[in-house]
Amino acid sequence: MITLAVDCMGGDHGPSVTLPACRQFLEHHPDARLILVGGQDSLQGLVHERVTHVVASEVVTMDDAVEVALRRKKDSSMRVAIQQVKDGVAHAAISAGNTGALMAIARYLLKTLDGIDRPAIATQMPNAQGGATTVLDLGANVDCTAEHLLQFAVMGSALVSVLQDSDEPLVGLLNIGEEVIKGNDVIKKAGELLRSAAKSGDLNFHGNVEGNDIFKGTVDIVVCDGFVGNVALKASEGVASMIAGALKQEFSRNIFTKMAAIVAYPVLSAIMRRMDHRRYNGAALLGLRGLVFKSHGSADVLAFEQALIRAYDAARNNLLDRVRARVAHAAPLLAAADAQPAS
C-alpha cells in the first residue's frame, strides 16, 4: 500500500480542486492511501476508508515570504504534509502551494542527500517523439555552479530511469548552441564535467542542446539552471495555450470552418491532448531524503490528480532509493568536481 500526504489547502483553488482530485485518484488506485492535511472543516469534503485526516491550523499562501512560511507558520498544511514523510508515515508529499516555501520547508525537514548541495525541481515536457523530455532545474536554483548542473544530471538520470524504465537515459546540457565553445563559463565548465562523467560511465551525455531540442526529443533529460528552466517551462505553456486559442478562434469563424472543425475533431483532439500541460503536472523535488512533488498552483482537478499519480509512481518504483544509489555511485566524480578550484 502506497501512502501519500496531500496538502489540501495549497494552490490557487485549495480544497475545491484537491479533494475532487483525491477522490478520482482513489477510484483509480485501489492500493493507495491518502493522508489529507488541512483545515478541519475543509477536510470533511472527502471521507473514505483509505483516507486519514490530519488537521493543520495554518495555510502557506502564494504571497508568503519563505521566512514566514518556514519560521512562523509551523502548523501549516504544507509543513505538516511534509512532516508525514519525515516521520515515515507517508511515502511522498504533494502540494500545489508556494514553490519557494515548499522547497525551503522540504529542505529543512528532510535534508539533502549526501553529495547533493541543492535540490532541483524536475518535470516533463511533451516532445515530437510522442513521449516527454525531463527538464531540471525549473526554478529552485536561479544561480547554479557547474557542479550543481552535474548533480542535476545525475539525479535526473535516476528520475528518468523510473519514468521511462531506461537504464541509460540520454542527458543534454541546455546552451545557446551545440558547439562546446558556446555558452558562459559555468556552462563550459559544466560541459567538461559532464563529458568526464560520460567517460567514467556515470552518465550518458549527448552534449550541448538548444531550446528546440526539448520539444524535438533529442535527449531524455535537459539540464539547466532554474532561471532558464522556469522561463522555458512558462514559455512552452504559453505557446500551447496560444495555439489552442488560435485553433478555436479560426474554426469558429463561420459555418464552413465549423464544419471543417467537426471533420478534423479526432485529429485536433489528439494533438491538443499531446500538448495539454495538465497531463505533465507534478514536478519532483530531487535531492532530498524523502519524496516531495509540486503541483502547478493553478492546477485543475485533472492536473492535480496527475501530480498524485506521479508521486504514487515514484514511490511504487522506489525513486528515492534509485536517486540515492545513482548519487552514491557518482560520489567520487561529484567530490572531485567540488574539489576543483572555481574558474
From Swiss-Prot:
Its EC number is 2.3.1.274. Disulfide bonds: none annotated. It is found in: Cytoplasm. PANTHER family: FATTY ACID/PHOSPHOLIPID SYNTHESIS PROTEIN PLSX, PHOSPHATE ACYLTRANSFERASE. Belongs to the PlsX family. Catalyzes the reversible formation of acyl-phosphate (acyl-PO(4)) from acyl-[acyl-carrier-protein] (acyl-ACP). This enzyme utilizes acyl-ACP as fatty acyl donor, but not acyl-CoA. This is Phosphate acyltransferase. It comes from Acidovorax ebreus (strain TPSY) (Diaphorobacter sp. (strain TPSY)). The lineage of its organism: Bacteria, Pseudomonadati, Pseudomonadota, Betaproteobacteria, Burkholderiales.
